[in-house]
């Protein structure tokens, strides 16, 4: 039991170290197998990132009576904490899908670390939409907005990592090479549980609607990735996380506004 608990803690630290800028203990170490086992905890990283964003929002809202400024501070905190890890994937995918005519062209463009017009526009639009959704929710109920931050970060990561259960990897290089390994059903079940729990704070009906929307988007994006690339890449997972996060915020805003 204690050995299993220690291994779970180590896996959680590995997930935190991979997806955030938080320093991890040197004793944790790193291995591909360890990162694969850590996949179940990726949504818990979303809990951490969302909580950091909620805390930044709360602190900012105590200093200035402007929800828009507090939301911007919240978003800045999450970007700093993650190093814009998923936004980078969104930008790479936008450049690749927007500028490539074949799967090889798209993958080549996505490997280029430089950002192009499609990538810049995609990231700007995603950040603007996220800011607007959160600001609209915060203007109605600040507590709901903070809860939505945690729910959106957790659920989006839980749904994005599920591609490792069902889709093949299109290339064997890039940031996500270590994590883009087949995911076991047990790990997927844990990831789904960790990703879905925060949604229940908005009620069972709202959570069910959010999950249904995410599943539909997951199916559509999965087909698109397969048709355009022949599989998924780490950048695709970043794009998916960003899309899923926006969809969760959209559903939660619609629910709390009705």
UniProtKB/Swiss-Prot annotation:
It is found in: Cell inner membrane. It is an enzyme of class 2 (transferase). HAMAP family: CobS. One of its GO terms (molecular function) is adenosylcobinamide-GDP ribazoletransferase activity. The gene is cobS. NCBIfam families: cobS, PRK00235.1-3. Its cofactor is Mg(2+). Pathway: Cofactor biosynthesis; adenosylcobalamin biosynthesis; adenosylcobalamin from cob(II)yrinate a,c-diamide: step 7/7. InterPro entries: CobS. It catalyses: alpha-ribazole + adenosylcob(III)inamide-GDP = adenosylcob(III)alamin + GMP + H(+); alpha-ribazole 5'-phosphate + adenosylcob(III)inamide-GDP = adenosylcob(III)alamin 5'-phosphate + GMP + H(+). Pfam families: CobS. Keywords: Cell inner membrane, Cell membrane, Cobalamin biosynthesis, Magnesium, Membrane, Transferase, Transmembrane, Transmembrane helix. Its EC number is 2.7.8.26. This is Adenosylcobinamide-GDP ribazoletransferase. The keyword Nucleotide-binding does not apply. The chain crosses the membrane at residues 41-61, 65-85, 115-135, 136-156, 197-217, 236-256. GO terms for biological process: cobalamin biosynthetic process. Joins adenosylcobinamide-GDP and alpha-ribazole to generate adenosylcobalamin (Ado-cobalamin). Also synthesizes adenosylcobalamin 5'-phosphate from adenosylcobinamide-GDP and alpha-ribazole 5'-phosphate. Belongs to the CobS family. GO terms for cellular component: plasma membrane. It comes from Ralstonia nicotianae (strain ATCC BAA-1114 / GMI1000). Its main location: membrane. It is a multi-pass membrane protein.
């Amino acid at each position: 039991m204690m050995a299993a608990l220690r291994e779970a803690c180590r896996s959680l630290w590995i997930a935190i170290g991979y997806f955030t800028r938080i320093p991890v203990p040197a004793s944790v170490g790193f291995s591909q197998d360890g990162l694969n086992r850590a996949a179940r905890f990726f949504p818990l990283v979303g809990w951490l990132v969302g909580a950091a964003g909620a805390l930044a929002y709360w602190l900012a809202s105590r200093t200035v009576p402007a929800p828009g400024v507090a939301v911007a501070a919240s978003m800045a905190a999450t970007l700093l904490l993650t190093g814009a890890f998923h936004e980078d994937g969104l930008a790479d995918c936008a450049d690749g899908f927007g500028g490539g005519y074949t799967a090889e062209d798209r993958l080549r463009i996505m490997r280029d670390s430089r950002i192009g017009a499609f990538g810049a526009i995609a990231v700007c639009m995603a950040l603007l939409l996220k800011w607007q959704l959160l600001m609209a929710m915060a203007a109605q109920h600040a507590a709901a907005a903070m809860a939505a931050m945690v729910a959106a970060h957790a659920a989006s990561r839980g749904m994005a990592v599920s591609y490792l259960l069902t889709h093949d990897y299109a290339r064997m290089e890039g940031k996500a090479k270590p994590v883009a390994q087949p995911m076991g059903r047990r790990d997927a079940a844990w990831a789904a549980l960790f990703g879905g729990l925060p949604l229940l704070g908005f009620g069972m009906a709202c959570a069910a609607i959010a999950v249904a929307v995410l599943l539909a988007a997951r199916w559509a994006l999965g087909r698109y990735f397969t048709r355009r690339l022949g599989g998924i890449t780490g950048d695709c997972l970043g794009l998916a996380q960003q899309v899923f996060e926006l969809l969760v915020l959209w559903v939660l805003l619609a629910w709390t506004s009705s």
